[in-house]
């Protein structure tokens, strides 16, 4: 069995590469122990995944067979079995949990608070003196939670008292049903297993629904359920099916049009509407409160497309105002918005091609516009023409394809000789991806407005954010409206955090230019169960697509370094040095 430390190592490496020293610091053991753990993990993972050294970045995890990998980890994860025991019993004393798990009672006592924290957004774990621990949820939700858990971790199915033959017959019957097309066969079978396991605890009254499909499926599997259990099962499935009927593409499109700032981005298309509609239908017809696999951190994706994930939060708020939907995974909707943003990245960025040979200039212009997305190549045939064009527009890049020498003050240029090659195209792509921030990060992150905030131990994140914003308003770096937007956004949850750096942000209507302010903290703070050491306040315009790439650039730079390097940044100068190195 993998121990808690080894499972934590896997968790850490799922998020990003780590050095042995960093892993040792996070787990409280020596580097030599970490290396032994990695050897044992690779042996246990048995080709489904592998941990390997990747140069200066440290060790990283590569997963080859994703489903098998997650199932193997579940076999070693006692949290699933602990939660299942709590769901299967009305009350469970700690000694009984320890006996069922064949683990010391001290382990259970230590694990219960962590289990509560792990599932705090999913269910409420409570205790009652003299009775024991229990899941404080409605009967309906307890059934769905247990069904999700049995579907996620097949090793728990014997706890429900089901034989292998029963399970095989049940799976076949559920796969062949067609009455509820939005519900997959394995989801239906997990619901039946949960009802069967809880059949003697069901007290809710459900109406009688027409049809006997469920009864036939249960009988085909060789199981027996009483009338009350069959009514509960049928009622639960029909309720979920009827809830899904209220969702339509027109509903979704109407809500999307009400999301603040979405009109200027022009990203509402048939694909986005179809993706979100399908997701909502699945959420209603087959709720999944417990994910079917371990969730990796979404922070890097949220940092790359913050506008998308913020729009998803606004959309979900509007959705909940209009419909009572148990939506439990906002991250997927954020990904759908991110995909829509990528599909509509049609703003063509200006590139000046300085060339004194007409034929070569034309060939190179066609090649660049064909192979480099979202760019517009303007040909300048002399230095004076280049100066004139630059007075009218600010080019993202100047390509010197001539014999002229450019002024040393021009720092956003590359030199390409003769007809451009594939290597030249790749050079242009790489430059465009990061040039505008890499060459002049001071333009976006200014020294004025970056300071040290002396927070005290126990000070809340909301209070810290308010105080920092108040200081920036007093110094006229951000407006009172922007401060209010930042504070409100932080209060919505799903805070943007990348490798020990929190990024409170807002979409400003005051200025189009990105503005970032780096603030160090006196004490580490825990936000969303993650430790942060510094704060980066950011204001940007959601429709300034080009400058939104700063977020993804930031994420890539921050994730290149161990967490201890980010945590050790001493101030603005150290932060800027990090960006210049990128």
Swiss-Prot record:
CDD domains documented for this protein: PTS_IIA_fru (cd00211)
GO terms of molecular function: DNA binding; kinase activity
Residue ranges flagged as DNA-binding region: 20-39
Gene3D superfamilies recorded: Mannitol-specific EII, Chain A, Winged helix-like DNA-binding domain superfamily/Winged helix DNA-binding domain
Domain of life the protein comes from: Bacteria
EC numbers: 2.7.1.-
Keywords noted in UniProt: DNA-binding, Kinase, Phosphoprotein, Transcription, Transcription regulation, Transferase
SUPFAM superfamilies: Phoshotransferase/anion transport protein (SSF55804), Winged helix' DNA-binding domain (SSF46785)
Keyword Kinase set for record: yes
Function of the protein: Could be involved in the regulation of the transcription of the FRV operon.
Protein's UniProt name: Putative frv operon regulatory protein
Lineage: Bacteria, Pseudomonadati, Pseudomonadota, Gammaproteobacteria, Enterobacterales
Gene that encodes it: frvR
């Amino acid at each position: 069995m993998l121990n808690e430390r080894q499972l934590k190592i896997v968790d850490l490496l799922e998020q990003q590469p780590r050095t042995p020293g960093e892993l040792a610091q996070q787990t409280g053991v020596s580097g030599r122990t970490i290396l032994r753990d990695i050897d044992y993990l690779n042996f246990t993972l048995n080709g489904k995944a592998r941990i390997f050294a990747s140069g200066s970045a440290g060790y990283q995890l590569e997963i080859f067979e994703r489903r098998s990998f997650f199932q193997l980890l579940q076999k070693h994860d006692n949290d699933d079995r602990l939660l299942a025991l709590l769901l299967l019993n009305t009350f469970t004393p700690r000694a009984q949990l320890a006996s069922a798990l064949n683990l010391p009672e001290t382990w259970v006592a230590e694990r219960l608070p962590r289990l509560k924290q792990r599932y705090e957004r999913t269910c409420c774990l409570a205790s009652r003196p003299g009775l024991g621990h229990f899941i404080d949820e409605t009967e309906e939700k307890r059934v769905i939670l247990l069904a999700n858990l049995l579907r996620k971790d097949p090793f728990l199915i014997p706890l429900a008292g089901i034989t292998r033959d029963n399970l095989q017959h049940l799976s076949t019957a559920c796969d062949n049903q067609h009455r509820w097309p939005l519900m997959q066969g394995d989801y239906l079978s997990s619901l039946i297993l949960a009802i069967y396991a809880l059949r003697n605890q069901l007290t809710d009254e459900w109406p009688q629904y027409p049809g006997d499909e469920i009864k036939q499926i249960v009988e085909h599997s060789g199981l027996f359920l009483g009338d009350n259990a069959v009514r509960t099962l049928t009622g639960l499935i029909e309720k979920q099916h009827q809830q899904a009927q209220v969702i339509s593409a027109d509903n979704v499109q109407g809500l999307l049009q009400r999301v603040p700032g979405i009109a200027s981005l022009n990203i509402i298309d048939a694909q986005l509407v179809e993706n979100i509609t399908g997701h909502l239908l699945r959420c209603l017809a087959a709720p999944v409160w417990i994910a079917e696999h371990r969730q990796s951190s979404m922070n890097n994706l949220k940092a790359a497309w913050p506008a998308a994930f913020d729009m998803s939060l606004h959309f979900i708020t509007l959705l909940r105002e209009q419909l009572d939907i148990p939506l439990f995974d906002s991250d997927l909707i954020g990904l759908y918005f991110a995909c829509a943003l990528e599909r509509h990245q049609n703003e063509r960025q200006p590139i000046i091609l300085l060339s004194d040979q007409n034929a070569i200039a034309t060939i190179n212009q066609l090649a660049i516009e064909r192979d480099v997305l979202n760019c517009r190549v303007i040909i300048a045939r002399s230095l004076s023409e280049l100066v004139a064009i630059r007075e009218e527009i600010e080019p993202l890049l100047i390509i010197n394809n001539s014999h002229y020498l450019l002024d040393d003050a021009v720092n956003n240029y590359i030199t390409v000789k003769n007809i451009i090659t594939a290597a030249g195209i790749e050079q242009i792509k790489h430059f465009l991806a990061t040039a505008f921030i890499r060459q002049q990060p001071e333009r976006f992150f200014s020294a004025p407005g970056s300071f040290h905030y002396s927070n005290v131990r126990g000070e809340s994140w909301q209070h810290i954010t308010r105080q920092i914003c108040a200081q920036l308003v007093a110094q006229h770096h951000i407006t009172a409206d922007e401060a209010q937007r930042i504070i409100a956004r932080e209060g919505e949850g799903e805070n943007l955090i990348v490798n020990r750096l929190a990024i409170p942000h807002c979409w400003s209507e005051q200025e189009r230019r990105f503005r970032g302010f780096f603030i160090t903290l006196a004490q580490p703070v825990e936000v969303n169960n993650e430790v942060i050491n510094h704060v980066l306040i950011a204001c940007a315009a959601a429709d300034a697509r080009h400058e939104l790439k700063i977020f993804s650039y930031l994420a890539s730079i921050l994730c290149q370094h161990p967490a201890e390097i980010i945590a050790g940044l001493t101030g603005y100068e150290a932060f800027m040095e990090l960006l210049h190195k990128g």
